[in-house]
Structures are given as structure tokens and as C-alpha cells.
Amino acid sequence: MAKKLLQKLSDISRIHHRAAFTDVLKHTAPKPSAFLELARNRYSCRAFEDREVPANMVESILEAARLAPTAMDKQPVHVWVADTGDTMEKLGKATQYLYGAPLVFVVGCKPDEAWVRKYDGKNGAEVDAAIVGTHIMMEAADLGLGSVWVGSFDPAVIAAEFPELEGWEVVALFPVGYPAGAPAQRHSERKSMEEFASEL
């Protein structure tokens, strides 16, 4: 069954090489799910309108983040919301990639509280934080907001400017706000299904 489906997707992908993912879905499902539509429409937003995000939207994003799955449900993750001039100025010392967003979600983890794979000692803290971050981005998109994953920041500056984060490893920053820019051209450039998936 899986082999036939992958072959069908591969054939379609060859016909529509580098085409939008929706073209493939037209041949495999009667109607894309709401989540696939959301995933397709979300993009990394690097320009924001100069207006605040309502408190109820911030709460909704935090709730989506709180509900994110983590390994063994250990939840070694914390989210901080930066939305004041002073806090944003401090974050701006650590990265140039805030893009004028009205608020930033800071996601951190504690490796010593995370699940560890016994076979090789792989720590799941950063993976857990990444899942939380993905929930932040997807909920923001569902609310009509833009977001972008920012991994380019100076951890030493973060530590110096925010001593209250001691003991936490900051994984990513998520500027969020009302989008004012279009997706980058490369956003729609996806691997073909043949390149992306295969039978094991």
C-alpha cells in the first residue's frame, strides 16, 4: 500500500516537478485538510506592521505552545514573552533579526530535565523546544499573524542581559506580529516527493 502510494506521488511529482505541494494533493486526496492548508500558507515573515497583538491572541499562542508534545511528557521547556521597549532593546543587542515585530516569544529548555535516549545519551531537550516553537508558529499563522524562527543570536549577550534566564538554554526566538511582507521567493521551492520521501 505504502509502495503504491509513494510510486503514485513520485509519478505525479515528476509530472509537476517543483510545483506547489497542492498540485500533488489534488491527485491523492479529494480535499486538503485544514492543517495542510495552514502549513501551506504559513511562511517566515520578515516584516511586520506597527501595531500590537491583542492579549487574547498571545494567550492562544502560549496555550498552543503549552500543549506541544515532549519526550516522555517531561516538558523541559519554558516560553518567555518579550513585548516592552526595554526588553526588546535588550534582545536587539543579541540579534539583528527582530524585524520590527511588536513581540517576541523566547523558547528555552533545560537539558537536565529532559528525556535522554539510553542507547547513545541523546538528549531530547532541544527537540522538545523545537516542537514547542513549531506550535507557536502554526498557531500564530492560524490567527492571521506572521512569525519567523530566529536561531541567529548571541547566547552570551542573552545571558548577560537576562540573568533571570540562568539555568535555561535559549533555543530560538520567535518574532510575531501582523505580517507586512510577502514570502521570500525560495519559500515555494520544495523538493519533489520523489526526493523527499521513499519506502524503507
Region locations from a protein language model:
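Acidic, surface-exposed loops and disordered segments
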Residues: M1-L200
